[in-house]
């Protein structure tokens, strides 16, 4: 956060993902920028970062206006990731279908492209572009 940029008011990468979100009716939420980059490298472009471990009300409103019907929660397998998952679930479970893929690593950003293709993509059931 800074005087001119408040992370809780934005979703990282939304400007790149918005057309893919509308096309697939699915938004994939990850914690950080590195996670967004890694998923893009694996061909999953309807993903955005929440800048940390909790979803703000402003970010929730952005998701509600994104055209998504499904929210994929793809946070890390550490304590912060579990906190983020709970925050997202609390704000989105009554408004969206929720998908929570499982993966073997701790950090999404540390996975190889091959691991994402093998472990994550099949669980998305074609809800990516």
PLM regions and their residue ranges:
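Short, small/acidic-rich helices and loops at N termini and domain boundaries
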Residues: 19-23, 107-129
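Residues at the starts of beta-strands that form the adenosine-phosphate
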Residues: 46, 70, 97
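Phosphate-handling DNA/RNA-contact segment within nucleic-acid enzymes
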Residues: 1-66, 84
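Acidic beta-strand-to-loop metal/phosphate-binding motif
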Residues: 29, 66-80
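Short, acidic/turn-prone active-site loops that include or flank metal/cofactor-
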Residues: 51-56, 76-79, 103-104
């Amino acid at each position: 956060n800074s005087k001119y940029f408040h992370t809780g008011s934005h979703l990282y990468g939304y400007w790149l993902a918005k057309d893919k979100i509308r096309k697939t009716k699915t938004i994939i939420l990850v914690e950080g920028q590195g996670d967004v980059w890694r998923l893009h490298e694996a061909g999953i472009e309807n993903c955005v970062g929440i800048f940390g471990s909790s979803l703000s009300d402003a970010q929730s409103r952005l998701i509600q206006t994104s055209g998504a019907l499904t929210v994929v929660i793809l946070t890390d397998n550490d304590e912060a990731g579990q906190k983020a998952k709970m925050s997202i679930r609390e704000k989105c479970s009554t408004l969206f279908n929720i998908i929570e893929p499982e993966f073997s690593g701790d950090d999404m950003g540390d996975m190889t492209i091959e691991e994402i293709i093998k472990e994550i993509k099949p669980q998305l059931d074609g809800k990516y572009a």
